[in-house]
Amino acid sequence: MERCVVKVRRVRGGDQNLPCYMTVHAAGMDLCADLVDDLVLNPGERKLVPTGLAIALPDGFEAQIRPRSGLALKHGIALVNSPGTIDPDYRGEIGVILINHGSEPFVVRRGERIAQMVFAPFARAELVEVDELDETARGEGGFGHTGR
């Protein structure tokens, strides 16, 4: 398991909890909503939820913002751009774009865990333009090519 040191800043000061791993083997840290007032997310509606946090990642690492499975299963709450990517040179507040795919309004409260943040190394590619690509068994088989 690769480790990285991530600097974190509370954007508005505040006393909100910093993200943390909820279990010893968790891959993601839970991110919480940093709200003054409750936020109501009606069915079909999407809103940007502030976390009150900004981070500085080491070079070669990204932070992926992912949905929480419990919110998805129990309430139909998902992330519009999943995963969201925080680049190592971004220094602004982390926001989470939530959408309500459920049938009931969902209330987001201050301090509620709304997403997970997973840190991952990444590679920067060098693109080489060619006239043809190597053949593979799959070829150009796309969506659903192996069955249903």
Swiss-Prot record:
- Does the record's keyword annotation contain Hydrolase? yes
Q: Which reaction does it catalyse?
A: dUTP + H2O = dUMP + diphosphate + H(+)
Its GO biological process terms? Answer: dUMP biosynthetic process; dUTP catabolic process
Q: Does the keyword Hydrolase apply?
A: yes
Q: Which InterPro entries match?
A: dUTPase, dUTPase-like, dUTPase-like_sf, dUTPase_trimeric
Name the Gene Ontology molecular function terms of this record.
Answer: dUTP diphosphatase activity; magnesium ion binding
Q: What is its EC number?
A: 3.6.1.23
Protein function: This enzyme is involved in nucleotide metabolism: it produces dUMP, the immediate precursor of thymidine nucleotides and it decreases the intracellular concentration of dUTP so that uracil cannot be incorporated into DNA.
Q: What name does UniProt use for this protein?
A: Deoxyuridine 5'-triphosphate nucleotidohydrolase
The organism is Geobacter metallireducens (strain ATCC 53774 / DSM 7210 / GS-15)
Task: Name the encoding gene, please.
Answer: dut
